Regions:
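Cys/His-rich short segments
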Residues: 316-319
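Accessory, non-ATPase domains that flank or precede helicase/AAA+ motor cores in DNA-metabolism machines
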Residues: 1-277, 284, 289-305
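Short, basic/glycine-rich phosphate-binding loops at helix/coil junctions
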Residues: 309-313
Length: 319
């Protein structure tokens, strides 16, 4: 990236590693009983004879629940840091931390997607791509499909195949098209295997999603241009939807193009690249015509649904 796009090494690294080191994990603090119930019960009897009411309340609650939310203990039981420190020094309790993953995706109302069967044309497109993938050096794939032809269903089928091989997938979608409805289709099909990043998320939320990817907790990352640098260990597929969109070209140094960078990452990691558009960019279409890309066409809308009607209205002279 530094050599191809004329940037410094620092600029290239900041692009590839977009999450700053100063972002820390979000954790929840817990107080846990660290002695036996018998010893705790004996200690509670002793404390009840003293004036240490806060210690008594905390120990009584711990004997019932064994593990308490630190915030709850402070608010509801009046537990202070001095009480916690004293119990820690005496070996009565220990402090534990649970990591909390930050996310802006509300998945509560997302149910499983009704699986739509592939049309004959979509099935033929998938088989054509699969034949290309069996070659020693498969080409990037460009799907030219009219609006509503079901390119996303083809992507999902190819992602399913990739995941069945134990590999991971990245789906690039322009920020303007990264809507709840778009994300919902992937989440409804793949569930918790999917994560999303976008520019509206906080740095902490993005940090957590990249961390989940690095740990292997997810297998599909959906997002704009920056999602290309998701730290997957075994990347198998990169999908670039609406590849003609100008937002795939970075306006900041290094001024890389996501399409070219995706193809290079795929080459380095032995992954596959699939691009799709109803109106492919001149560059991509030229590469396809020259045989550098495999061109796959979807000419019919799904279930032969008609295109929306368009009317031309003359508004001149109207208020």
């Amino acid at each position: 990236m530094r050599e191809n796009y004329g940037s410094t090494m620092i600029q290239a690294l900041r692009t590839v590693l977009p999450i700053q080191e100063k972002i820390k994990a979000k954790e929840k603090k817990y107080i846990c009983l660290d002695i036996s119930e018998e010893a705790g019960a004996q200690l509670l009897k002793e404390l009840e004879q003293t004036r240490f009411k806060a210690r008594t309340r905390l120990l009584r609650e711990l004997l019932e629940k064994k593990r308490l939310d630190y915030t709850h203990a402070a608010k509801e039981l009046g537990t202070t840091s001095a009480v916690v420190k004293k119990f820690q020094e005496q070996g009565i309790i220990r402090i534990e931390y649970d990591e909390i993953m930050r996310t802006s995706l509300n998945t509560g109302d997302i149910s499983g997607e009704r699986r739509m069967p592939l049309t004959d044309e979509q099935e033929a497109a998938v088989k054509q791509i699969q034949r290309e993938w069996k070659k020693p050096s498969p080409k990037p794939v460009l799907i030219e499909g009219v609006t509503g032809s079901g390119k996303t269903q083809v992507y999902i089928k190819l992602i399913e195949q990739t995941l069945s091989q134990g590999k991971e997938a990245i789906v690039l979608i322009p920020e303007i098209a990264l809507t709840y409805q778009t994300v919902r289709r992937f989440y409804a099909r793949f569930g918790d295997k999917v994560s999303v990043i976008n520019s509206r998320q906080s740095q902490g939320e993005r940090y957590d999603q990249f961390k989940r990817a690095k740990r292997g907790e997810i297998q599909v990352m959906v997002g704009p241009r920056s999602a290309l640098f998701t730290p997957f260990a075994d990347l198998g597929l990169i999908v670039i939807d609406e590849e003609h969109e100008p937002t795939y070209k970075s306006e900041n140094t290094p001024r890389y193009h996501a399409r070219e960078t995706a193809i290079e990452r795929a080459r380095m990691e032995h992954a596959r690249v699939v691009m799709g558009s109803a109106t492919p960019s001149l560059e991509a279409y030229s590469h396809a015509c020259d045989g550098e890309y495999l061109l796959v066409k979807l000419n019919a809308r799904y279930e032969e649904r008609p295109l929306p009607q368009v009317s031309i209205v003359d508004l001149s002279g109207k208020n």
